[in-house]
Amino acid sequence: MPDGRASTRDYMKHTGAVGVLALDEQGRVLLVRQYRHPVRHRLWEMPAGLLDVPGENPLHAAQRELWEEAHHKAGDWRVLIDVYPTSGGSDEAIRVFLARDLAEADGEKFAAEGEELDMEVRRFPLDDVVRAALAGDLHNGALVAGAMALKAALADGALDTLRPADAPWPARPF
C-alpha cells in the first residue's frame, strides 16, 4: 500500500488495449456494432482490440484494428486519451487514438470470426454520439470517454496539440 502496510487484493491482470476514434472530414466518427457476450448485448463501439501481439506497439495495434474491424486506414494519428476503465478490479489500460485523413483500406477485407462475424460498421455525427451517451443509449466506456474527449478537443481547437501517436504510455511502456 502507499503507506507501506501490506494488504491482500484480488484483481484481474490485463494485457491492455487500444481504441480508435476515427473522425472524417464531415465530423462523423466511424463505429462498429457487435455482440458482446459478457453483457449479452450488441453494442456500438469504436474499432478496438487487445495488445495481444508480442512486440507490437500500441499505434500498430490501433492501425491493425482499424483495418480489421472497419477496413479503413488513416493518414494522421494522435493520442486522444489514456484510461484505466476498471481501476478497482483490473490493471487494464486503454489508449484511445484519434485517427484522421481516413480512406478505405486496400486489398481484401479481414476474415472475421467469432463475435466479429456480423459486425456492422457505420459513421455517426460526433454530436449524435455525445447526445446518445448522455441519454444513456451508449454503454461502451472507452467510446463514451473518447467521444467526450474529442468533443472537448474540438471545442478548444486543440486537435493539433494532442500528443503524438508514439507518445510515452507509462501504463504500457513499449
Positions of predicted regions on the chain:
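Unchanged
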Residues: 18-19, 50-139, 160-174
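Short connector loops/turns at beta-strand edges and beta->alpha or beta->beta junctions
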Residues: 35-38, 102-103
